Amino acid sequence: MSKNYIAEGAVVKGKVQMGEDVSIWYNATVRGDSAEIKIGDRTNVQDNAVIHVDTHYPTTIGNGVTIGHGAIVHGCTVGDNTLIGMGAIVLNGASIGENCIIGAGAL
């Protein structure tokens, strides 16, 4: 049984698939309007983060991922057990492997 949590003020719109035990925190935006977003099990999208897509760039996020406060993940792939640091920006076509750390504020 899925126990996903979507905090007050968070927005999840469009073509979004979520695994189990996913948490989307305050004022985060997950917007799959022009392509699909897939979010794996036990992934944590922290406050004010944005997950978005572009027409030819869906977004796929693995299992056990943390997307830090204010990070932007746009049209890319993020592998399992990866941390996207606070305020980091990951752009169209990027592919981040498993067990990686993207530092806070990185582009």
Give, region by region, the residue ranges found by the protein language model.
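Left-handed beta-helix
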Residues: S2, A7-E8, K13-G14, G19-E20, ...
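Phosphate/pyrophosphate-binding betaalpha-module
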Residues: E36
